[in-house]
């Protein structure tokens, strides 16, 4: 007959913890942050990495939680519109609103939030959101055979541009928030805006290191 204390035998092995669990417990390592740890790419500012926050066709407004690096649910859109294309940000960039540079990426399929891809800038959409500058880079997926040949926003069908403009003009109307979209600008304006945001980010890092 077995002894009730057999289960408490000192010879019984404890479950093994892998290195990831151990490092998390000891807090000796930190998970990669998509804004700061992912490189922008060797061809930037023309071709660059984009971290997708919101999938094409989604009504959920996801966004980067800057403290944790995770993608969080910000809100559900108040109107019936959905995001016309995949939407995200360029790592290692910084804009005047203290956020990374926003990008709308045209491609065939929706991409899961948190994934990253290579994109090419084809234009810039100047935008004012509630009185503050909030420009968007318009880009195409550099590895999508249907879109990678586009190099200028003027090459897009007029309906596609109207769709993008109307989405951003309307998506906050039911929240009583004003958004104004100006005329689309050419690729060089987008490239210059990205380079400026890269320079701002570099200054931010240098300032942080001096503290």
Swiss-Prot record:
Tell me which cofactor or cofactors this protein depends on.
Mg(2+)
Instruction: Provide the activity regulation entry from the record.
Output: Strongly inhibited by Ca(2+).
Q: Which residues bind Mg(2+) 1?
A: 97, 102, 134
Question: What positions does the entry give for substrate binding?
Answer: 61, 75, 87, 171
Q: Which GO annotations describe the biological process of this protein?
A: diphosphate metabolic process; phosphate-containing compound metabolic process
Q: Give GO cellular component annotations, separated by semicolons.
A: cytosol
Q: Which residues bind Mg(2+) 2?
A: 102
Q: What is its main location?
A: cytoplasm
- The UniProt record lists the EC number as 3.6.1.1
Q: Does the keyword Transmembrane helix apply?
A: no
GO molecular function term, any single one = magnesium ion binding
Q: Name the InterPro entries on file.
A: Pyrophosphatase, Pyrophosphatase_sf
Can you say where in the cell this protein is located? Cytoplasm
Write down the chemical reaction(s) this protein catalyses.
diphosphate + H2O = 2 phosphate + H(+)
What keywords does the record list, in alphabetical order? Cytoplasm, Hydrolase, Magnesium, Metal-binding
* Similarity comment: family membership: Belongs to the PPase family.
**Extra notes?**
At least 2 separate genes code for soluble pyrophosphatases in potato. This protein is probably encoded by the Ppa1(a) locus located on chromosome 12.
Please give the function described in this protein's UniProt entry: Catalyzes the irreversible hydrolysis of pyrophosphate (PPi) to phosphate.
- Recorded protein name is Soluble inorganic pyrophosphatase PPA1
């Amino acid at each position: 007959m077995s002894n009730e204390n057999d289960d408490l035998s000192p010879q019984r092995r404890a479950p093994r913890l892998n290195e990831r669990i151990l490092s998390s417990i000891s807090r000796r390592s930190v998970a990669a942050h998509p804004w700061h740890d992912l490189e922008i790419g060797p061809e930037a500012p023309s071709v660059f990495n984009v971290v997708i926050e919101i999938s094409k066709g989604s009504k959920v407004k996801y966004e980067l939680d800057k403290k944790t690096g995770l993608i969080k649910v910000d809100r559900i859109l108040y109107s019936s519109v959905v995001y016309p294309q995949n939407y995200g940000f360029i790592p290692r960039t910084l804009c005047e609103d203290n956020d990374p540079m926003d990008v709308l990426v045209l491609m065939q399929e929706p991409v899961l939030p948190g994934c990253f891809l290579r994109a090419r800038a084809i234009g810039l959409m100047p935008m004012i959101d509630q009185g503050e500058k909030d420009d968007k880079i318009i880009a195409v997926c550099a590895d999508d055979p249907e879109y990678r040949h586009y190099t200028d926003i003027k090459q897009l069908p007029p309906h596609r541009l109207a769709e993008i403009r109307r989405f951003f003009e309307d998506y906050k109307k039911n929240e009583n928030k004003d958004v104004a979209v100006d005329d689309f600008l050419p690729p060089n304006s987008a490239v210059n805006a990205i380079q400026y945001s890269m320079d701002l980010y570099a200054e931010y890092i240098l300032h942080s290191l001096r503290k």
